[in-house]
Amino acid sequence: MLKLEIKKIKFVNILLVSLIIPLLANAFGLINYLGNKGALTNQWQSLWTQVSLFYFSFFYIPLIAIIIASLWATEHKASLKFIRLSPKKNIDFVIAKLGLAFILVSLCQIYFLGLFYLSGKFIAGFASIDFSIYLYYMILSILLSLPIIGIFGALAIRIRSFGIIVLLSTIFTIFGFATAFKSLKIVGLSFLAIEANNLRYIGINDLALLALFGLGEIIISLYLSDKFLKFENK
């Protein structure tokens, strides 16, 4: 299934989004750091607070939403004909899209971290870096992307407009931060964004809650995706 989904991808559209959004976040963060260099004195840590602020606060959830919506756009252009004629179950297509989107998001995160290192090393002129805490945030951000992929995958089955998907992802980002500032773990990525911006490790209890909410959101989104596909295929 995954190989089949890869063949159907419109790589140009996804590649442009995947390259531009992490680049913009790093550029804004770097410019903000250089403009406030006198007050930001901790080099890598200071640059990270600026870069992660822009990326996780404004860009990451919309990026995920655009990627999964792009994957479903291919099916919508064919009026879901391939899914309708396939002997495979609807949920198989949903899981395949989720898996492919997860791989693409993971690659975006590796690219984002690489840009962070290159900008700090060659533009800001920092010395060597201890990657441990940044890798920790990247791994968590990749894992916590799964619920978002599931949620916007379900929405993308019913909503064909990219504009509406981006708008909903922006509203979802605002909602996530509103809950995260109250220490709620409903939107794991928003909670992670606050912790990452403050360079804090997340406690075991909080990680367990994030996993619990995330698993619940994935299960619900898979169920809704299956129902939405059945409705669309009528």
What positions do the PLM features span?
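Helix-loop-helix units of permease transmembrane domains in multi-pass membrane transporters
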Residues: 69-102
